[in-house]
Design a protein with these regions (language model features):
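Extracytosolic ligand-binding ectodomains
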Residues: 2-459
Length: 459
């Protein structure tokens, strides 16, 4: 039997704390230099980051992604590499920003790099991200990590581009990627690719989606269509709901399930059988007792990219319109990675993508031991990208090449970190090697292991 997600998290102990130093550290894969670590005393706190002004915008960007244009080479430097961290270190998101900074500091400590210096800058405030980028670049930053929010990325990007310095943002909004900007967050596209590919490998043919009527929902539908075009099958149904609909989705799910047409077809079948007097027809009519509809919905896999209370409000309503989740496979997103998902019977047997839970658990243990707190979900992005920077300082670039050139950042073998393997693609999006989890009551388990290299097939 495959181990459950919860058992992975419980297995981290004193022994794995030591293993963390070798396993969770990011290393360039397949032929590039690995990083070997030993446990050391936790470093002294670093000086407080320089602040800019208060109030970072958080609304997502809406512009289409631009193709990544290689920078002319970036700054050529010797000695210690300076890497900026653009984070909201004051204001409403200060706790998140501090957690991201903690994760980056932890990565620097574990890497034992003496060739890397972090330059934290506060993005809070009107124009804060642009001011933070300018401040860091004036201090000699050769690479920018962050910001978190898409609008802040848009503000910082032109400043960095003018200096030929690449940006690896912590956003998951692919619309800000391109022209020297990378998106290292967990994009819906990457998540949907993984779960659709897995569903296809298990026989799913016809896909449907039940999504919020929002830009996120639109992006999810586009990602589903693209994934199905890549891996095969067809998208047969799409239904949208507003954010206030989740407690009663009756009209939306009724239409999604073709419930009225299937009820009408059942009625016709019953009437036809009732008009006959032979024993076979009588037996067939009796078998229809308790049946609500004729046939199945026009899909065998249903994507529901929600989580938390919304997911738990939506799922029980499926059976009201005869969507039998024993015959229709439910598919989810990272938002399903919640212990309460396991308590909803309608989601039993559903699949969702996730980073490898064992390496994630090791990162969380390391963070907890160091900072006496649990890291937020996206803190591992700051951890992994800081380790990426540390790894690239371990080897010298080619003559005339920047340490953080586009070519070095986008090496096809990729990197491995707390969230498994990832690589920065030429379109500015991070591709990730994800696992697939199957939901079961108090015992969800991995059914599709995460790949360990990018030439390894997944199923």
């Amino acid at each position: 039997m495959m181990p459950s997600i919860s058992s992975f998290l419980r297995r981290v102990d004193a022994v794995s704390w030591r293993l963390l130093l070798a396993v969770s550290v990011l290393a360039v894969l397949a032929g590039c230099q690995n990083v070997n670590l030993v446990q050391r005393k936790v470093p002294e706190p670093r000086p407080a980051p320089q602040a800019t002004a208060p109030g970072e915008p958080q609304t997502p960007a809406t512009e289409a992604p631009a193709p990544l244009t290689p920078l002319p080479g970036g700054p050529i430097s010797t000695g210690k590499a300076r890497v900026a961290l653009l984070l909201p270190l004051s204001g409403a998101n200060a706790a998140l920003g501090q957690s991201m900074l903690n994760a980056a500091e932890l990565a620097l400590f574990l890497s034992e790099s003496d060739k890397l210096e972090l330059l934290p800058r506060d993005t809070e405030g009107p124009g804060g991200a642009a001011a933070a980028a300018s401040s860091a670049l004036d201090a000699g930053a050769e690479l920018i990590l962050g910001p978190i929010f898409a609008n802040a990325v848009q503000d910082a990007a032109p400043i960095a581009r003018a200096r030929n310095v690449p940006v690896i943002s912590f956003s998951n909004d692919g619309t800000v990627a391109g022209n020297g900007v990378f998106v290292a967050g967990f994009t819906p596209e990457n998540q949907i690719d993984r779960v659709v590919a897995f569903a296809r490998s298990r026989g799913a043919q016809k896909f449907a989606a039940l999504v919020p009527d929002s830009p996120y929902g639109t992006r999810t539908i586009e990602a589903l269509r693209q994934s199905v075009a890549t891996f095969g099958g067809s998208v047969t149904r799409v239904a949208r709901y507003t954010s206030t609909d989740t407690q009663d989705l009756s009209p939306v799910i009724r239409q999604l399930a073709d419930y009225d047409a299937r009820r009408a077809a059942l009625r016709v079948n019953r009437e036809a059988l009732a008009a006959k007097n032979d024993e076979a027809s009588k037996a067939a009519l009796k078998r229809l007792d308790g049946v609500e509809t004729a046939g199945d919905p026009q899909f065998d896999a249903l994507l529901i990219p929600e989580g938390g209370s919304r997911l738990r409000a939506i799922a029980p309503q499926l059976s009201l319109f005869d969507i039998d989740t024993r015959r229709v496979r439910t598919l989810g997103s990272f938002d399903w990675n919640d212990p309460l998902t396991e308590t909803e019977p309608a989601l039993n047997g559903g699949w969702y993508p996730t980073p490898p839970p064992d390496s994630r658990a090791q990162f969380e243990t390391s963070y907890q031991k160091t900072f006496n707190a649990s890291p937020p979900r996206i803190a591992s992005i700051a951890f992994d990208t800081t380790l990426l920077a540390a790894v690239l300082t371990r080897t010298d670039p080619d003559p005339g090449q920047a340490r953080f050139s586009i070519e070095r950042l986008t090496q096809p073998n990729g990197f491995a970190g707390a969230d498994g393997i990832f690589r920065l693609k030429s379109n500015g999006i991070a591709e990730r090697g994800l696992a697939v989890v199957e939901v079961h009551l108090r015992a969800s388990r991995i059914v599709g292991p995460a790949p360990t290299t990018f030439d390894q097939p997944t199923n």
